[in-house]
From Swiss-Prot:
Optimum temperature is 37 degrees Celsius. Its EC number is 3.5.3.15. Its cofactor is Ca(2+). GO terms for molecular function: calcium ion binding; protein-arginine deiminase activity. The keyword Calcium applies. This is Protein-arginine deiminase type-3. Pfam families: PAD, PAD_M, PAD_N. Catalyzes the deimination of arginine residues of proteins. It is an enzyme of class 3 (hydrolase). The N-terminus is blocked.
Amino acid sequence: MSLQRIVRVSLEHPTSAVCVAGVETLVDVYGSVPEGTEMFEVYGTPGVDVYICPSVERDRERAVARRWHFDMGSQIVVVMNSPSNVNDTVTFKFPTIPAETPRPLAYAVLYLTCVDITLDCDLNCEGRQDRDFVDKLQWVWGPSGHGAVLLVNCDRDSMSSNDQEHCDHHVRCLQDLEDMSVMILRTQGPDALFDDHKLVLHTSRADAERARVFHACGPEDSCEAYRHVLGQNKVSYEVPRFHGEEERFFVEGLSFPDAGFSGLVTFHVTLLDDSNEDFSESPIFTDTVVFRVAPWIMTPSTQPPLEVYVCRVRNNTCFVDAVAELARRAGCKLTVCPQAENRNDRWIQDEMELGYIQAPHKTFPVVFDSPRNGELQNFPYKRILGPDFGYATREPRDNSVSGLDSFGNLEVSPPVVANGKEYPLGRILFGGNLPGSRGRRVTQVVRDFLHAQKVQPPVELFVDWLAVGHVDECLSFVPATDGKGFRMPLASPSACFKLFQEKQKWGHGGALLFQGVIGNQQVNTVSISQVLSNGSLIGYNKFVQSCIDWNREVLKRELGLAERDIVDIPQLFKMERRKAVAFFPDLVNMLVLGKHLGIPKPFGPVINGRCCLEEKVRSLLEPLGLRCTFIDDFTPYHMLHGEVHCGTNVRRQPFSFKWWCMEP
């Protein structure tokens, strides 16, 4: 709401003033009151409401009675609720004192011209511009909250442009307007008022760097009609009244929430009195709206899949075919990045994370490009960015990145409740070192970005013990029809040793791992008994289990998980250069497409014609209604310290829950 305006009246001549509908105007009569005045009378024409507040301690009263005791502490407030057609008046009469020497009454006359001015936007997140809402200065989270939403216009609707839309000062195609939020300036009042008054739309210099405004100045079907009026180097704009009572503006975000930017952007419209050529303009009224830039939102593997991405390289034809078949069963679109574009970089999960942004009027996917910058670095920008598909990235200025900055180290949980707090969009998970220890961590610019989105508060896990150092090496999430609606498969050396011990007990100690591996001469078979007699392997996996157990407790605490929500998947690790890598293909590093799971084929011990590791995983996951498909990734991925999840990526359906309804 605008600050209360003060108007001073005079006994010498009538006073003229402009007021805004619904906004209080404080009338100062004290400077003109005859000395000794004890009473006064006040009259308002129809449509003018006058209120008297006798003192600070007492509530104001409507001036129904015409005569009032005069007190220097009294306040006189005038309100009009509809625009003027003619000048309305308020008249003050001051009887002179002493009464035995009567003189003519003293009069003060106030002529009022009322104008209605509102700056409106979609404050209730209902897809319409609401002019009846009161508190536009606050942006309030929650199901009963309010405030308008702004999308970062980070897609590329115009195929004639090589840049994202927010890099352009022009509207290149009309589809671009669909990504913007509408802001409407409504004015009602005598046309003559605007001969010596003007309206100025303005924002702060900081907010001008974070949003851009276009004014619709002509035919709606012409791109040239949309004039860039605010944003970047433009902080104010005198609004011409092209359309009389209603001017439409289109607003686009330029920056996602980040360190130093909460996501809030504010715009004001101010009515200025420009009637005196000898003086500068004076403000009469300001209306304000606040937008929040929509956060980038990740989707967990439990969300329905829409599109699967995979790279074709020189030795993974069978792998690509297997992923294509799984995508077909799941009803997903398949996008294959050819070798000419990936230049033999197969790690498409590490290159990017697919999420989305949402406003009441529009939702579209946004790819977050990692700072790893391998041979795939151009793929997200050149091949994914396009109409209604946005792009974002964060890179440290000194280019100091580690393996932990690849996005295999970036996951998100399904919706959870932890410690009495709801996380309806889940929580982001990424890995680092132990608190207070030296080691690899996710680069600060990425951490700042993820924390600033607010709606999926991050949890940091301990992954520095892993050679690659990604959270997807030790956990995943799969959908379930009971409980919390999901399970968390977690790598477990203890479960693997227990399984092997059972098989050895039943006389299968000679069963071999790695039988049937095709196309690689570096792998020697090893029996169950050899594994169970390898003291260094057992000792190292006890250490690995302790690291996983640390994460297990963090996840139980931060995600509100119980033991029944965790599925222990048998998995062993070995040491290379003092870090852990998977001993056999990492079973939790899976591709989740609804009920269809693409799991790395472990080449485990074959007993009675069946791989005992595959059989165990099926027994754990298929009762949940899931279908397990084991994909041979041994040579093209496992031998390079990656698996199925590392070599694929998935665009998923956005949450049905609206982010502005949550309470961070």
